């Protein structure tokens, strides 16, 4: 084996199979690039990103763990989101939820 070498099986790696997903259009209205990580609660991202935040509640980007999506100023793109799993308790981020998602859905 060569140091740093990867040995992977042929084919595709499927992520989040069977999980609820949705697609939304996101536009960066800011004057700086905005990068969003794979496990960030998407409804709470930077306010300069304009999209349907209610639709994004309880979802994150449907991308591989540890990766991110970058939105350049003025850029508009469609992204796929995947439902958060587990206990669906959200703390931190921008502080909009701070607890159970379903308890805050009023």
Swiss-Prot record:
Its EC number is 3.5.1.5. It comes from the Bacteria. The keyword Cytoplasm applies. One of its GO terms (molecular function) is urease activity. Pathway: Nitrogen metabolism; urea degradation; CO(2) and NH(3) from urea (urease route): step 1/1. It is found in: Cytoplasm. SUPFAM superfamilies: Urease, beta-subunit. GO terms for cellular component: urease complex. One of its GO terms (biological process) is urea catabolic process. Keywords: Cytoplasm, Hydrolase. It catalyses: urea + 2 H2O + H(+) = hydrogencarbonate + 2 NH4(+). InterPro entries: Urease_beta-like (IPR002019), Urease_betasu_sf (IPR036461), Urease_subunit (IPR050069). Pfam families: Urease_beta (PF00699). PANTHER family: UREASE. Belongs to the urease beta subunit family. Heterotrimer of UreA (gamma), UreB (beta) and UreC (alpha) subunits. Three heterotrimers associate to form the active enzyme. NCBIfam families: PRK13203.1, urease_beta. This is Urease subunit beta.
